[in-house]
């Protein structure tokens, strides 16, 4: 018996849970099987990709949101034969610019000083549509 569903793997960003895909799931057609994944807390993007890849379908479309885009590219690098298509959302396909690197370093500093929740809340308005709140 062949699998008639199309598999779409959804990888959220570093501060996201699988909830980030809830609204999308509500409007997805019945022939689309969603596989929502959360990035495990590992130090290396390739290690994160390896852990996630272990439990994914044989063939699938892949969507990475924010940091999940970097993880998706790492999955693509080792399992191109399994990926039918790639979607990068609110991410990029290369290294951070110097300005982005400075922003990330400042964000890490704020988070390490106890400002994590404020940092995440401050970014929500620029990342998500107001109807998603």
Q: How does the language model describe each region?
A:
Residues 124-128:
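Active-site rim beta-loop-alpha module in soluble metabolic enzymes
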Residues 64-68, 72:
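Gly/Ala-rich beta-loop-alpha elbow adjacent to hydrolase catalytic centers
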Residues 23, 74-78:
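Active-site signature of alpha/beta-hydrolase-fold catalytic machinery across serine-
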Residues 62-64, 89:
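Short beta-strand immediately N-terminal to the catalytic nucleophile in serine-hydrolase-like folds
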Residues 4, 56-58, 81:
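Active-site acidic short loop of glycosyltransferases
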Residues 77-78, 82-120:
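Flexible "cap/lid" loop of the alpha/beta hydrolase fold
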Residues 44-46, 92-99, 130-131:
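A short beta-to-alpha transition loop/helix N-cap that caps and shapes the active-site region
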Residues 2-46, 50-51:
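Conserved HGGG/HGGXW glycine-rich cap/lid loop of the alpha/beta-hydrolase fold
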């Amino acid at each position: 018996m062949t699998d008639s569903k199309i598999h779409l793997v959804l990888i959220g960003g570093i501060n996201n849970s699988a909830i980030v895909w809830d609204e999308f799931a509500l409007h997805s057609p019945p022939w689309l099987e969603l596989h929502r994944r959360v990035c495990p807390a590992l130090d290396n993007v390739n290690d994160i990709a390896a852990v996630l890849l272990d439990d994914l379908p044989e063939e699938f479309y892949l969507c990475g949101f924010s940091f999940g885009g970097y993880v998706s590219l790492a999955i693509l690098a080792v399992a191109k034969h399994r990926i039918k298509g790639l979607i990068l959302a609110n991410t990029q396909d290369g290294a951070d610019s110097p300005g982005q690197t400075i922003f990330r370093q400042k964000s890490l500093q704020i988070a390490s000083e106890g400002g994590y929740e404020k940092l995440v809340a401050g970014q929500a308005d620029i990342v998500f549509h107001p109807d998603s709140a």
